[in-house]
């Protein structure tokens, strides 16, 4: 099968398309998936460049990729038919740092705890965009912040991968959402449900907002320090 692999840490020039990658072996608690689409995130190039090698050293050759969508071809021992079965359309994470075989391949193995059934209304491409950013946004809003109905939250970088998902999830939780974006992205985040949109290039958000319950900062730097003023 084909896969995108690296044989050493480095920038994009170390990535190779291997036409003869062995099909990944299936073990207990995992599923084998025929990949239909895969998502690309900043963490993928960070892994490729060795940014996580102290915590998660790769064994080369290593198949890249985390987010995916596809169809289950085989289930391992310990996977109940009530959870997943052959033919199920799923999406989730198959990165090697989370026990998978790498999503940038025609076939991938993923932990059953790292996947979910794909909603019928989502295409494979749409579903493959969601896992990493969706989990990150959901954990911050529900576990770290415990955001609830009628609370006010400022989300920095609302047009980005995590920010755009965070806006939608925060609105589904009943929160009032303000966000910072560039002027050209204002229509996009308004469509997502943002109640207040601030152009970060021309408007000082800390002078416009006050008494907010939470700030979700996906930007960092000086934005982080200035954000304390709105709480």
Name what the model sees in each region.
Residues 87, 105, 150, 194, ...:
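Local beta-strand N-terminus motif with an aromatic residue
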Residues 83-85, 147, 231:
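Short, well-ordered loop/turn sites that connect or cap secondary structure elements
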Residues 178, 192-231:
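Glycine-rich cofactor phosphate-binding loops and adjacent beta1-alpha1 units
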Residues 79, 93-157:
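NAD(P)H dinucleotide-binding glycine-rich loop of Rossmann-like/cofactor-binding domains
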Residues 2, 89, 175-177:
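Residues at the starts of beta-strands that form the adenosine-phosphate
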């Amino acid at each position: 099968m084909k896969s995108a692999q690296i044989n050493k840490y480095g920038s994009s020039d170390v990535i190779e398309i291997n036409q003869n990658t062995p099909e990944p072996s299936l073990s207990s608690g995992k599923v084998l998936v025929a990949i239909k689409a895969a998502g690309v995130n900043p963490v993928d190039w960070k892994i490729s460049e060795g940014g996580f090698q102290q915590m998660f050293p790769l064994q080369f050759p290593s198949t890249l990729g985390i987010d995916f969508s596809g169809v289950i071809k085989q289930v391992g021992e310990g996977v109940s038919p009530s959870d997943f079965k052959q033919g199920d359309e799923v999406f989730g994470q198959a990165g090697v740092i989370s026990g998978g075989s790498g999503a940038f391949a025609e076939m991938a193995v993923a932990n059953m705890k790292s996947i979910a059934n794909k909603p019928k209304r989502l295409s494979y491409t749409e579903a493959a965009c969601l896992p990493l950013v969706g989990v990150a946004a959901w954990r911050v809003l529900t576990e770290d912040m415990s955001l609830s109905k009628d609370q006010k939250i400022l989300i920095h970088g609302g047009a980005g991968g995590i920010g755009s998902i965070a806006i939608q999830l925060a609105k589904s939780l009943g929160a009032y959402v303000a966000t910072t974006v560039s002027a050209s992205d204002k229509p996009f985040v308004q469509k997502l449900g943002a109640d207040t949109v601030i152009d970060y290039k021309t408007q000082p958000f800390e002078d416009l907002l006050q008494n907010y319950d939470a700030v979700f900062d996906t930007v960092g730097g000086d934005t982080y320090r200035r954000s304390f003023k709105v709480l």
